[in-house]
Amino acid sequence: MNIYAVGGAIRDELLGVPVQDRDYVVVGATPEQMTAQGFRPVGKDFPVFLHPQTQEEYALARTERKTAAGYHGFQFHYAPDVTLDEDLARRDLTINAMAREVSPEGTLVGPVIDPFDGQADLRARVFRHVSDAFVEDPVRILRIARFAARFADFTVADETLALMRRMVDAGEVDALVPERVWQEIARGLMEAKPSRMFAVLRDCGALARILPEVDALWGVPQRADYHPEVDTGVHVMMVVDYAAKQGYSLAVRFAALTHDLGKGTTPADVLPRHVGHESRSVELLKPLCERLRVPNECRDLALVVAREHGNLHRVMEMGAAALVRLFERSDALRKPARFAELLQACESDARGRLGLDAQPYPQAERLRVALAAARSVDAGAIARGIGSDTEKIKEAVHRARIQAVAQALAIGE
């Protein structure tokens, strides 16, 4: 029995970046031998075991064969005579198909085992497929795109990009389950440069299949006086990258990605103006979230951002009553933390423009002051002074909030 550390841990060690997780492959063992040594079986489709002390995953060396379309259409073969090279050959990219032996004490020993020249591709900053079996798993398209968001200076090898396009043309991407698509998109959004993920997905044609609403934004012009970058797709990528650079949450980054979907359906005869794009964005966003089964917290923030971002940009011109109505529409009084994320998304929108990434956004501080004033109103005390007439209570609380905001900002109602 020989144990090897494989995949991403070896890649990251060679790149000099922190190793998050280690995957292990066991060559020359049977499931019975593993359990006899205290390993606990957890694999459903193929033998994977948890180490009795570290709880890390150890998989028996295996090969795989495509038997049906989609992510789950594989048949696995594992046996003591499956070699390490055979196991590495089934992996997606050369940079993920390297290994090092693990000593009985758990330390890495010996040289890097690199049958597919992954080290050369690491030095060249290239994503290259291990074999033509790459085409058998459509998730690999999403994984390469996600890796591009993490390793932003890498490029996809021409021959690998050609295979990805073949897979898209063959409909393989259409067979992916929504949960897996969302999982990979979400992970890519949380990387340092999410725009690289979408660039790779566009290059191979996959973005038009999994997120056609986003794909439609490229080539749509905006007013150059507001958007020096002009192209809507370019703008949205700048917004997402700004949100990533600030370390904002997944919900904020998803809202940044989807806030301008309605610009993709603006009638050609009114371009480059986009009057009413906010409401069109909301209508496109709802089925998108349902289709990909987007988590509620991401969906809910994205809907508020899509609907209200234009209003937030204009708050310097608003009176107190308009500000309170904005707070009520966005549920800011009950959900101030979500409103803070709304501000982050809108600030990203304002700064995700060519040459304007350091532009002041005084709207954010104005809204923070106004919301604090509105929330300082004691609705309970007002209700006790009025009695049981709920409509009167509601109107009195509303008026008190307007007055509090007007006083805090020294503006008219």
Swiss-Prot record:
Magnesium is required for nucleotidyltransferase activity. Nickel for phosphatase activity. It catalyses: a tRNA precursor + 2 CTP + ATP = a tRNA with a 3' CCA end + 3 diphosphate; a tRNA with a 3' CCA end + 2 CTP + ATP = a tRNA with a 3' CCACCA end + 3 diphosphate. Residues 232-333 form the HD domain. Mg(2+) binds at D21, D23. ATP binds at G8, R11, R91, R143, R146. Its cofactor is Mg(2+); Ni(2+). CTP binds at G8, R11, R91, R143, R146. Its EC number is 2.7.7.72, 3.1.3.-, 3.1.4.-. Transmembrane segments: none annotated. GO terms for biological process: RNA repair; tRNA 3'-terminal CCA addition. It comes from the Bacteria. One of its GO terms (molecular function) is cyclic-nucleotide phosphodiesterase activity. Keywords: ATP-binding, Hydrolase, Magnesium, Metal-binding, Multifunctional enzyme, Nickel, Nucleotide-binding, Nucleotidyltransferase, RNA repair, RNA-binding, Transferase, tRNA processing. Comprises two domains: an N-terminal domain containing the nucleotidyltransferase activity and a C-terminal HD domain associated with both phosphodiesterase and phosphatase activities. A single active site specifically recognizes both ATP and CTP and is responsible for their addition. Catalyzes the addition and repair of the essential 3'-terminal CCA sequence in tRNAs without using a nucleic acid template. Adds these three nucleotides in the order of C, C, and A to the tRNA nucleotide-73, using CTP and ATP as substrates and producing inorganic pyrophosphate. tRNA 3'-terminal CCA addition is required both for tRNA processing and repair. Also involved in tRNA surveillance by mediating tandem CCA addition to generate a CCACCA at the 3' terminus of unstable tRNAs. While stable tRNAs receive only 3'-terminal CCA, unstable tRNAs are marked with CCACCA and rapidly degraded. NCBIfam families: PRK10885.1 (NF008137). PANTHER family: MULTIFUNCTIONAL CCA PROTEIN. Monomer. Can also form homodimers and oligomers. Belongs to the tRNA nucleotidyltransferase/poly(A) polymerase family. Bacterial CCA-adding enzyme type 1 subfamily. This is Multifunctional CCA protein. The gene is cca.
